[in-house]
């Protein structure tokens, strides 16, 4: 399990890319991280390769996603952490050609975007919500992977 160190909290609150008020047109594989961004994508007829969510927004407000996923995988991931179970699931899902898969998180999903960037192929788009601002859209590239690798090295392994 990786634990977020206190000194990284502020850095990770800032968006890693451009923030959009509405979903831009995207041509490529998409991974959504977060309930509202997943719900928004699906409501706009965008079916992500992988959707990661916990059915809550703002830590405790229930969210309903009206969609039938091809497969739902459940993982535990405590707040402020990245569980080994979540890492292994994302690593596996990055290698398969399937789409419309849900990773339903018992806990908190926010930090899992880091693991998606680490393992998913270059060219994949990662979308996550930026509270009160909009949707952050990242296209995975070598530079972003290196930046995320440096951040993950600062996590505490327990």
UniProtKB/Swiss-Prot annotation:
Reaction(s) this enzyme catalyzes, per UniProt: 3'-dephospho-CoA + GTP = GDP + CoA + H(+)
Keywords noted in UniProt: Coenzyme A biosynthesis, GTP-binding, Kinase, Nucleotide-binding, Transferase
An example molecular function term from Gene Ontology annotations: GTP binding
Pathway: Cofactor biosynthesis; coenzyme A biosynthesis
Signal peptide residues on this chain, from the entry's feature table: none
Residue numbers binding GTP: 35-37, 54, 56, 109, 132
GO biological process, one term: coenzyme A biosynthetic process
Keyword match GTP-binding: yes
Role: Catalyzes the GTP-dependent phosphorylation of the 3'-hydroxyl group of dephosphocoenzyme A to form coenzyme A (CoA).
Family: Belongs to the GTP-dependent DPCK family.
Protein name, as recorded: GTP-dependent dephospho-CoA kinase
Species per Swiss-Prot/TrEMBL record: Methanocaldococcus jannaschii (strain ATCC 43067 / DSM 2661 / JAL-1 / JCM 10045 / NBRC 100440) (Methanococcus jannaschii)
